[in-house]
Amino acid sequence: MSIYDTLNEQQKQGVFTVEGPVLLLAGAGSGKTRVLTHRIAYLIEEIGINPWNIMAITFTNKAAGEMKERVEDLVGFGSDSIWVTTFHSTCVRILRRFIDRLGYDNNFVIYDTDDQKSLMKDVCKRLEIDTKVHKEKTILNAISSAKDELIGPKEYYQNTLGDYSKQKIALAYEEYQKALKNNNALDFDDIIVKTIE
């Protein structure tokens, strides 16, 4: 009996289609992870793809761990070479190798929420921003939203011309990014932004 015999027809189509992209749309618990793990096994065992040339990305560490276990059960030897990680873990792995191209050292640090707040407090002090009017958390949230849209400090500044309050945030954003770089640091949003850059 083959490991693929337990799959339904739609799942088999997802596993055995190797040319071009495959989009899996299905509800929770319907077997999407099963299709992905069996597809990985199929690519290695039947198509001859090297495990280190396969990447499977998930949203959570829990899902990545579960997928890694399932792939290991199906593939066995060589499964540890497959990239089964979250988006952020994948990006950090790429950045550790290539971030020097953006002017950072490869041993960069990742700032957590407390580090970010502390840095923003310093930025606000330097720029004489009244934190009773412009709270650090509000500024950091605005910066995070901008980064989610891949809007850098200069573009953010241009987009806020004429709005005094947002201009203050724009100035803080620019200074915040400079301070991060001077500290050879990234915040959580930068992990994806810098990988794209």
Regions found by a protein language model. Name each.
Residues M1, A28, Y176-K178:
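N-terminal hydrophobic alpha-helix used for membrane targeting or insertion
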Residues M1-T6, R126, D130:
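Short amphipathic alpha-helical boundary/capping segments
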Residues I3-T6, K32, L36-H38, Y42-L43:
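Conserved RecA-like helicase ATPase core segment
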Residues G20-H38:
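Walker A/P-loop
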